[in-house]
């Protein structure tokens, strides 16, 4: 109560921010007559003038009124469009490292031109981030004339572009691209073998469109570049045959419940659990198929890979549904994004799940992957000096934006008041009753010429509604992942009188639904339209537009509530743009996933008490409140998961930044000999210490062991025992110096043969390759550690602290291994003539290119964190702890690569 009173007196923080910014808007408006007097050349010349002022030390913020006034005037001349005052407010919010919540249809694309222009004046580059390639290309092409009129360059960063084209796009003042492509380019740059292979500049200012989709919905899914691991496709096929024999039971076995099935599914956490009966049956079937020996246990260490295959196959059959989670197209399993309903070509689930789904669908099984580099969007976007974003729905997630990204949310007022009617939810007992009610509503609306947009949460549901509409004889368009190419065209015409459009989730985001349909699309369809034709099309459109407004505007139907209120609000936001009339209603049933998992008992009890008849719906504020509470539960759970993921990834992030910064320094220098000399001293000191402990008696020295180690690891054949026999006065310090001097001498002789330049080139190559190889192993080990770290909780230890402690010691061990392997490799190298070295280098480059082509981009969910990490680890674990390490170092496995585990 007190807070409400204070807010009334002083205004909310949002009100105070807008009040302050409105003063600047008044200054910009006052400059308009002055700007109108300028010629095109003078207006364009303002860009050079602003840049000169910045170079002299003027602060960017001081340029806001003039810069915004220049962009507004240029937009009037180039597009015939003048920025509204609320768009100027939005532009200022975006410049202040904030998130601007602007309703659908308020012109976010035009608003973005203001902060993009202002921040491009610094010459450090602006990245405009969109959710898909179509929007990146559309926005870049639409805004290019404006930016080029003002003397700025525009680049587009698309997947599959060659490196020179990407470099050119990044060198532009303003670059448009998707979040995935920016992230993957960052990872690829940090895997480059020469400075010329890198494409990105230093990350300066990111302006993220649909910021909620990118920074929240996709935050749980790291970007991964992976290379192929060993082939185990045959095993997936064999295990896949067994799974259909298992029967699902409703819930997990407990003291009070014993089911008859073989596995249960936890829909909340999307996990599958085998029962005791299921385990016994699986083991029997594996023995029968000849996959496992009689008397063996599936849980024995020898069968850990088999357990991995069984778990993946079980999840593929029980949790992943065709046309909901993925589609099969041209013999390939393609993931469907749960948030947007779009297909994600080239993305693959990890942990063997994708292969298990391929086996289930009977398509060709592709190899498993091993992680080469990965980063989460949360950590990628926090690398920018300045970050801002815009969306139609951010206020519900304001706390998360603030706590994770340190971004405040400012709600920008609409240009015209919103008059859309949001009708209360209707809840039915069954799915069939709900669908029937939706069909009746559509019939009623279209009969009076009102366009209808039906939002569904999966391809399967959109096809179900489509079939029912076809049976009822209602013409309609379907917009889902399967019809991706027609997306913008279908959305543009969804406002046609009596048009019915079915869309999965937020497919078509970024394209406005214009009441009466899009007259621009009709003009674009004509080859050479005359002025008369265009006028006629516009006149016809005006008649249709008025008719649709008269009928009540666009009507939105939600076929079920999404887990997130924000996505429901996005669907509603497609209607009522720029003060247009419109309406919306959600239809629910007790069989919907959200109701079944989170709100069932209370609401179904209420419905039974009311004695509802088939086909009747309940419409009550209590029900709406119960559903909102269910959504809040899911949202807070998802927030906890994202926060947890970030806390763990922050540990890896510190290490990633250290490694990438080291790697970039290496790439930028041509001579690393000083570093090599310093490392050599450290390595030889540590090696000698193992056999001649410092300040020890000669009786404690292991000279034969030292000689053998130097021979095996550094190709140094030194007669140390002879030296000691012939020179009794040779003490420890002198001996150490002599061994190091001998190693340097041998190395210098090699350098004389091949030449200093070639040796420097070779040293750099060895350091980069060794670093990449060890970093890849370290990532797999970190994934493996992460998978089991929660078990430390049972020992009363904090898993996060344990993860930090262990990962740090693993990182330190990796850096030690790096030094050792670099010196060992350089010492063992057999010198050849320069021509031979060049030939070998050429072969290495070809091999690196081949590997790059084989690399696949995969996008993994947080609960499957290690791409084939188990495969990598168990392959290593077959070596005994006390056996010699397979890398050939001569050390025991536990003292060499075994340390990573």
Swiss-Prot record:
Residues annotated for ATP binding in this entry: 87, 105-109, 512
Domain of life: Bacteria
PROSITE patterns: SECA, SECA_MOTOR_DEAD
Record comment: activity regulation: The translocation ATPase activity is stimulated by SecY and a precursor protein such as proOmpA.
Membrane topology category: Peripheral membrane protein
Biased composition (Basic residues): 891-901
Catalytic activity: ATP + H2O + cellular proteinSide 1 = ADP + phosphate + cellular proteinSide 2
InterPro entries for the chain: Helicase_ATP-bd, Helicase_C-like, P-loop_NTPase, SEC_C_motif, SecA, SecA_CS, SecA_DEAD, SecA_motor_DEAD
Its EC number(s): 7.4.2.8
Function, in words: Required for protein export, interacts with the SecYEG preprotein conducting channel. SecA has a central role in coupling the hydrolysis of ATP to the transfer of proteins into and across the cell membrane, serving both as a receptor for the preprotein-SecB complex and as an ATP-driven molecular motor driving the stepwise translocation of polypeptide chains across the membrane.
Subunit structure: Monomer and homodimer; probably dimeric in the cytoplasm. It is not yet clear whether the form that functions in protein insertion is monomeric or dimeric. Part of the essential protein translocation apparatus which comprises SecA, SecYEG and auxiliary proteins SecDF-YajC and YidC. Makes direct contact with SecY.
Protein known as: Protein translocase subunit SecA
Organism (species): Escherichia coli (strain K12)
């Amino acid at each position: 109560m007190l807070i409400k009173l204070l807010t009334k007196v002083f205004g909310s923080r949002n009100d105070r921010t807008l009040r302050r910014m409105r003063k600047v808007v008044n200054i910009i408006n006052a400059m308009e007559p002055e700007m109108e007097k300028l010629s095109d050349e003078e207006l364009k010349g303002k860009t050079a003038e602003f840049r000169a002022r910045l170079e002299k030390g003027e602060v960017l913020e001081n340029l806001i009124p003039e810069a915004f006034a220049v962009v507004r005037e240029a937009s009037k001349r180039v597009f015939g469009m003048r920025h509204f005052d609320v768009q100027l407010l939005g532009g200022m919010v975006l410049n202040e490292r904030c998130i601007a919540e602007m309703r659908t249809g308020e012109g976010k694309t035009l608003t973005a031109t203001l902060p993009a222009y202002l921040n491009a004046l610094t010459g450090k580059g602006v990245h405009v981030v969109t959710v898909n390639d179509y929007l990146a290309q559309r926005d870049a092409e639409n805004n290019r004339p404006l930016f080029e009129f003002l003397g700025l360059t525009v680049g587009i960063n698309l997947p599959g572009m060659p490196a020179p084209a990407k470099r050119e796009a990044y060198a532009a003042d303003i670059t448009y691209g998707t979040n995935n492509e920016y992230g993957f380019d960052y990872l690829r740059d940090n895997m480059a073998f020469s400075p010329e292979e890198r494409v990105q500049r230093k990350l300066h200012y990111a302006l993220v469109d649909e910021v909620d989709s990118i920074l929240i919905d996709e935050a749980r899914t790291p970007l991964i570049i992976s290379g192929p691991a060993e082939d185990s496709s045959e095993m997936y096929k064999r295990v896949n045959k067994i799974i259909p024999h298992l029967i699902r039971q409703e819930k997990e076995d407990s003291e009070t419940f014993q089911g008859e099935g073989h596995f249960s599914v936890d829909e909340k956490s999307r996990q599958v659990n085998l029962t005791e009966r299921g385990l016994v049956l699986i083991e029997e079937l594996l023995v029968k198929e000849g996959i496992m020996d009689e008397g063996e246990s599936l849980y024995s260490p020898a069968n850990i890979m088999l357990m991995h295959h069984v778990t993946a196959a079980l999840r593929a059959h029980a949790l992943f549904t065709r046309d909901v989670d993925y589609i099969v197209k041209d013999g390939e399993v393609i993931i469907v994004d749960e948030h947007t309903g779009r297909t994600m070509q080239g993305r693959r689930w990890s942990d063997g799940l994708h292969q298990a789904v391929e086996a289930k669908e009977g398509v060709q099984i592709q190899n498993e992957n091993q992680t080469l580099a990965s980063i989460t969007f949360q950590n990628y976007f926090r690398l920018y000096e300045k970050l801002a974003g815009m969306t139609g729905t951010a206020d519900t997630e304001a706390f998360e934006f603030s706590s994770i990204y340190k971004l405040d949310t400012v709600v920008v007022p609409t240009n015209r008041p919103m008059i859309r009617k949001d009708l209360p939810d209707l809840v039915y007992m069954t799915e069939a009753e709900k669908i029937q009610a939706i069909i009746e509503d559509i019939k009623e609306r279209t009969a009076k010429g009102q366009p209808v947009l039906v939002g569904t949460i999966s391809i399967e549901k959109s096809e179900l509604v489509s079939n029912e509409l076809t049976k009822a004889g209602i013409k309609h368009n379907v917009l889902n992942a399967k019809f991706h190419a027609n997306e913008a065209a279908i959305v543009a015409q969804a406002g046609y009188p009596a048009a019915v459009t079915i869309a999965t989730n937020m497919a078509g985001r970024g394209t406005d639904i214009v009441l009466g349909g899009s007259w621009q699309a009709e003009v674009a369809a004509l080859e050479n339209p005359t002025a008369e034709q265009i006028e006629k099309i516009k006149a016809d459109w005006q008649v249709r537009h008025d008719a649709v407004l008269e009928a009540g505007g666009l009507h939105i139907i939600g076929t079920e509530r999404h887990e997130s209120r924000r996505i429901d609000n996005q669907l509603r936001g497609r209607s009522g743009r720029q003060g247009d009339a419109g309406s919306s209603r959600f239809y629910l049933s007790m069989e919907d996933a959200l109701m079944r998992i989170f709100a069932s008992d209370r609401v179904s009890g209420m419905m039974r008490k009311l004695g509802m008849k088939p086909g009747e719906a309940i419409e009550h504020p209590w029900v709406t409140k119960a559903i909102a509470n269910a959504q809040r539960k899911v949202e807070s759970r998802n927030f906890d998961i994202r926060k947890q993921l970030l806390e763990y990834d922050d540990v890896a992030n510190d290490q990633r930044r250290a490694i990438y910064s080291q790697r970039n320094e290496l790439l930028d220098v041509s001579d690393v000999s000083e570093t090599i000399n310093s490392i050599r001293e450290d390595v030889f000191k540590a090696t000698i210490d193992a056999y001649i402990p410092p300040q020890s008696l000669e009786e404690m020295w292991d000279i034969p062991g030292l000689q053998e180690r130097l021979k095996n690891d550094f190709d140094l054949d030194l007669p140390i025992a002879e030296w000691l026999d012939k020179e009794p006065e040779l003490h420890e310090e002198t001996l150490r110096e002599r061994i190091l001097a001998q190693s340097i001498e041998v190395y210098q002789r090699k350098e004389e043969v091949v030449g200093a330049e070639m040796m420097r080139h070779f040293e750099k190559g060895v350091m980069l390759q060794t670093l990449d190889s060890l970093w890849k192993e370290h990532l797999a080990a970190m994934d493996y550690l992460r998978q089991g770290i929660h078990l430390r909780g049972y020992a009363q230890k904090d898993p996060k602290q344990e993860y930090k402690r262990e990962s740090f010691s693993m990182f330190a061990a990796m850096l030690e291994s790096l030094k050792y392997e670099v010196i060992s490799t350089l010492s063992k190298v057999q010198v050849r003539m320069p021509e031979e070295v060049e030939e070998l280098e050429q072969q290495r480059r070809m091999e690196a290119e081949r590997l790059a082509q084989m690399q696949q981009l995969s996008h993994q969910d947080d609960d499957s964190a290690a791409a084939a990490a188990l495969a990598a680890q168990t392959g290593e674990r077959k070596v005994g702890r006390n056996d010699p390490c397979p890398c050939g170092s001569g050390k025991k496995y536990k003292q060499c690569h075994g340390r990573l585990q």
